[in-house]
């Protein structure tokens, strides 16, 4: 299937390992057993993995943690990106090895925003996040002008952000230009799912 600029694709499926593998393949972390894919020449990507522990094995502050991923080392620049994910004041001096799961996701999202990519791939971005952060993420993804491919078990997030649903099944996939709620109640989709199970 082709993904166009501005598509906000919810990648869904009964098997969360399959949706995670899909994101890992697109991000080059896993080799596909069949098939291939190709990004356009002007595409820049950023990826939020489902698991992020490997990114937080040091004792540096959040400022220093994010600074390592930036060409611009200026404190105000780094603080700005942490601030977008609701880190403020002395919070940016917190050690990265004592962060909660939600704080780690917020750091990873700050890192993604700093990359200024035009294609974002998010694997379960709302995991561990509090309601305020989910709302901030939801609003930023709704207004994001690039392409988004994401997996989320958060119904509201998926319904309000996605303009396209791709469901992975044991025997293929279903690609539908519908909202999540429209997709769920579509009888034709249910028939396709049964045929591909």
Locate predicted features:
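ABC ATP-binding cassette signature C-motif
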Residues: 1-197
